[in-house]
């Protein structure tokens, strides 16, 4: 039986956590990008380096404990977690906190104001594909380097909080990566379960080279730190239900790590997916979905149709596997090679 297919006992969990324990034995002020945050205090400010600006909150707890990094806005058009982290920053009392919480409220500020799907308008690059970045690179590469150097380096645990863009409808889910380090992979899976999210996707397709980590959370993983990606909310909405959901995920992380008093609300109906199958469009034109998120589909079932600019059917997209629909495009534009549907294979 795989370590990912059974619950881990508390004793083993504590052993796993202790094997990655980098917690300082003495509390000190947090010095971050020009600001000093004393023990038992918090500060929200615009951190700057050169032309890079990052809205951040540093909450330096009164007692020693882990460093939890939470980030939203890696893609500037994914809003619910931005609002959730604003609320979280306001509600945490540093006097009650064990450890330190680092919040990057909006990692891709230029993408946010440029109203772009995933990209940075300064160089048209996807921040979540440019890690660990380069200090002498393009705007996005320099941003990735700064996030790696100043934030990932300080963190013990990390959650990169996303949502579906304006074209995507999705089921809320969390990605639990694995990199071939048994203890790290098991601890990361426990961290994912502690999010309280129902849909947990195992994936190990990211590079394991820290010099070519590509994504924000994989940059943590390749440096020996659990790093999750959450997808909460969709279609570019900022609905209260998704904001509350993301806020509870962040709270669960704090409870799981013992940073705040509280009980982790596990999802008793959690579903673990061994992999996700993406289906590509073979033509450019209009996409019309025939299923929706949460639907159970069988191999060969029609998932959607592609028509040309004149309304002629050119492709029926079918499922290559049996599983659950996790994501589907809800807007018509489709280009050849794009994947408008994702189907999860259930463990």
Kindly give the residue locations of the regions a language model identified.
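Bacterial N-terminal signal peptides
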Residues: 9-19
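Structured catalytic-domain cores with a bias toward divalent-metal coordination
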Residues: 3-6, 20-347
């Amino acid at each position: 039986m795989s370590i990912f297919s059974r619950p881990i006992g508390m004793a083993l969990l504590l052993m796993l956590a202790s094997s990655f324990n980098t917690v300082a034995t003495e509390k000190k002020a947090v010095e971050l990008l020009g600001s000093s945050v004393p023990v038992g205090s918090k500060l929200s400010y615009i951190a700057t380096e050169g032309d890079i600006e990052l809205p951040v909150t540093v909450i330096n707890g009164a007692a020693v404990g882990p460093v939890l990094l939470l980030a939203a806005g890696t893609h500037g058009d994914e809003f619910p977690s931005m609002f959730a982290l604003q609320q979280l920053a306001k509600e945490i009392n540093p006097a009650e906190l064990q450890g330190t919480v680092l919040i990057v409220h909006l990692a891709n500020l230029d993408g946010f104001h440029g109203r772009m799907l995933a990209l940075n308008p300064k160089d048209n690059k996807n921040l979540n594909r440019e890690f660990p970045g380069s200090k002498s690179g393009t705007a996005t590469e320099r941003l990735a380097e700064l996030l790696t150097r100043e934030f990932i380096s300080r963190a013990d645990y990390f959650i990169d909080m996303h949502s579906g863009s304006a074209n995507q409808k999705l089921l809320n889910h969390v990605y639990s990566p694995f990199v071939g380090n048994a203890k790290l992979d098991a601890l990361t899976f426990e961290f994912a379960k502690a999010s309280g999210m129902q849909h947990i996707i195992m994936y190990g397709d990211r590079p394991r080279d820290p010099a070519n980590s590509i994504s924000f959370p994989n940059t943590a993983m390749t440096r020996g730190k659990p790093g999750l990606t959450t997808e909460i909310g969709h279609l570019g909405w900022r609905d209260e239900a998704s904001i509350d959901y993301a806020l509870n995920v962040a709270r669960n992380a704090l409870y799981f790590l013992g940073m705040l008093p509280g009980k982790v609300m596990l999802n008793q109906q959690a579903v673990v997916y061994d992999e996700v199958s993406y289906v590509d469009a073979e033509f450019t034109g209009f996409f019309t979905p025939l299923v929706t998120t949460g639907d159970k589909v069988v191999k060969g079932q029609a998932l959607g149709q592609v028509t040309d600019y004149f309304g002629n059917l050119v492709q029926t997209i079918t499922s290559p596997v049996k599983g659950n629909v996790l994501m589907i495009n809800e807007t018509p534009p489709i280009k050849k090679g794009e994947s408008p549907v994702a189907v999860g294979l259930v463990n």
